[in-house]
A protein has these predicted regions:
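Conserved S-adenosyl-L-methionine
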Residues: 227-237
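Hydrophobic/aromatic residues located in beta-strands of well-ordered beta-sheets
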Residues: 116, 180-182
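Conserved N-terminal segment of class I S-adenosyl-L-methionine
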Residues: 1-146, 150-154, 163-169, 234-235, ...
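Short, glycine-/aromatic-enriched active-site segment of Class I SAM-dependent methyltransferases
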Residues: 182-211, 216-221, 242-246
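Short glycine-dipeptide loop
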Residues: 174-180
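Short catalytic micro-motifs in class I SAM-dependent methyltransferases
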Residues: 154-161, 183
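Feature marks short, surface-exposed loop/turn motifs that line or immediately flank catalytic pockets
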Residues: 125, 188-190, 236-239
Length: 292
């Protein structure tokens, strides 16, 4: 199996001589070292992968929505944001959500698409979606060549030890000229790069996240997979209240506390725009085209 470092090296986003230890351990494992490429800024874990079984069983998730039936606030909020932001690529289109989780995005847009399906490893999620009338497969191999207008994948790519073959499979199922929308966490997150918030660093580094990309490394990866017309934009998932709580109390959840009263639409949009100016959003989104 190719390691994520080998892939990063192949695309010119990491070199052995530029490797430095970023953290001795992650939030869930003391035996996993996290590295940073001092030249590119990419953050990565080399030589570790928990295995597909972890994702099939779903034990790594902090909440199992298929069992609890609850609607996690962050997941619901993300689904709403994505449905609005990516509507031009979804409305009236045939789409697949690769790594769809409990299907929050698919459920949100199902009345707007021409057809839709999900791909997900976690077995109970697959069963629940199929039971609810949303087609869900465990592999892209179930989908025909050139059959879809749009492929979306939200916070999945960073989990993959070999992302290039997966991106190639996404290209295979897309029609010529089809669109891929890829969302990943950002190595230049304001709390990490600019504020050096150790509490947040200890929380956000996770053995399941094998890489935190920069704009450049994400663009290189998609280009290496054969995509073209690649546009990268920054998105801020967590608002000012969240950052204030990390800085004042060294804990997550500020966006669900009394401080959330600060997060008016105007302030939230302005904060995201300000972070974009310095390339410090917590999330990157790539929108890319499959060659015609």
């Amino acid at each position: 199996m190719t390691t994520i470092f080998e892939t990063l090296h192949e695309i010119g986003a990491a070199r052995e001589e530029d490797r430095e230890v970023y953290s001795e351990g992650t939030r869930d494992r003391d035996d996993v070292t996290v590295y940073r490429d001092r030249r590119s800024g990419v953050i990565y874990i080399d030589g570790f992968y928990g295995g597909d079984e972890v994702y099939e069983e779903g034990g790594y998730r902090e909440k199992n929505l298929a069992k609890s039936g609850s609607r996690d606030y962050e997941i619901a909020r993300d689904a709403e944001r994505r449905a609005t932001a990516y509507r031009p690529f979804v409305c009236g289109r045939t789409i697949v959500d690769f790594g769809c989780g409990d299907g929050s995005f698919l459920r949100k847009v199902q009345d707007e698409t021409l057809s839709l399906c999900g791909v997900e490893l976690q077995r109970d999620y697959v069963e629940a979606l199929n039971r609810d009338g949303i087609r869900c497969h465990t592999s892209l191999e179930a989908l025909e060549n050139g059959s879809l207008d749009t492929a979306v994948s939200f916070h999945v790519l960073e989990h993959l030890p070999e992302p290039l073959p997966v991106l190639g499979a996404l290209r295979r199922v897309l029609k010529p000229g089809g669109t891929a929308v890829i969302e990943v966490p950002h190595a230049n997150d304001f709390l990490l790069r600019d504020l050096s918030c150790e509490a947040f660093k200890g929380f956000t580094l996770w053995s399941q996240h094998l890489v935190l990309h920069t704009r450049d490394s994400l663009r290189r990866l998609l280009a290496a997979a054969g995509f073209e017309a690649i546009a990268i934009e920054g998105v801020q998932r967590y608002p000012l209240s969240n950052h204030l709580t990390w800085l004042s109390s060294a804990r997550p959840g500020g966006h669900k506390s009394a401080l959330a009263a600060l997060d008016t639409a105007d302030l939230t949009n302005a904060y995201e725009a300000a972070l974009n100016r310095i390339d410090a959003t917590d999330t990157l989104v790539a929108i890319a085209r499959n060659p015609a």
